[in-house]
């Protein structure tokens, strides 16, 4: 159980259809993980920690071979050494700010009116800082990664998921 063959990490930002993506990939019987663990990945030990935390609350799928997680915040660092592991696959996904920023503000106005994300300026700072961090990560890994246009997941799901499936094989 503690040694799946593969890890998939989605590196993105809030409101980029990552929940949709997570439910799609998590519906695969070979994949365990469909929600954000809210942890960093600092070394290979973090991959083990992910499994321990996940299986504390979730059942092991029969025949699973892959763990999935998404990292959406700079508070949860991801080390290049983790992304460079031969059994780790990295997916980056971005959504256009024109749609992302109002979506962040609207969400927090509904769920927590006192949250800082109610401010368009705060949401913009988060988005810019997150994209800067993602750019730095992408620049520093020498292993191929997959870029998923968040809008394509909704607007052209079949082609998008087909391409991703081919890449994951």
Pin down the residues of each PLM region.
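Short beta-strand segments
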Residues: 10-12, 67-70, 147-149
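Generic signature of intrinsically disordered, low-complexity segments enriched in small/polar residues
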Residues: 20, 24, 37, 44, ...
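A general marker of short, structured functional hotspots
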Residues: 50, 69, 122-123
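Glycine-rich phosphate-binding loop used to anchor ATP phosphates in small-molecule kinases
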Residues: 60-80
């Amino acid at each position: 159980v503690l040694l799946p063959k593969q890890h998939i990490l989605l590196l993105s930002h809030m409101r980029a259809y990552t929940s949709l993506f997570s439910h799609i990939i998590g519906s695969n019987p070979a994949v365990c993980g469909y929600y954000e663990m809210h942890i960093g990945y600092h070394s290979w030990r973090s991959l083990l920690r992910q499994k321990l935390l996940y299986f504390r609350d979730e059942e092991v799928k029969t025949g699973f071979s892959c763990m999935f997680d998404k990292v959406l915040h700079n508070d949860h660092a991801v080390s290049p050494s983790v992304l460079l592991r031969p059994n780790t696959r990295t997916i980056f996904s971005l959504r256009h700010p024109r749609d992302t920023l109002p979506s962040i503000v609207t969400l927090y106005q509904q769920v927590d009116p006192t949250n800082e994300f109610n401010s368009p300026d705060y949401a913009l700072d988060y988005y810019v800082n997150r994209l800067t961090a993602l750019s730095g990560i992408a620049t520093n890994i020498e292993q191929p990664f997959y870029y998923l246009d968040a809008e394509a997941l909704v607007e052209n799901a079949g082609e998008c998921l087909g391409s991703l499936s081919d890449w994951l094989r």
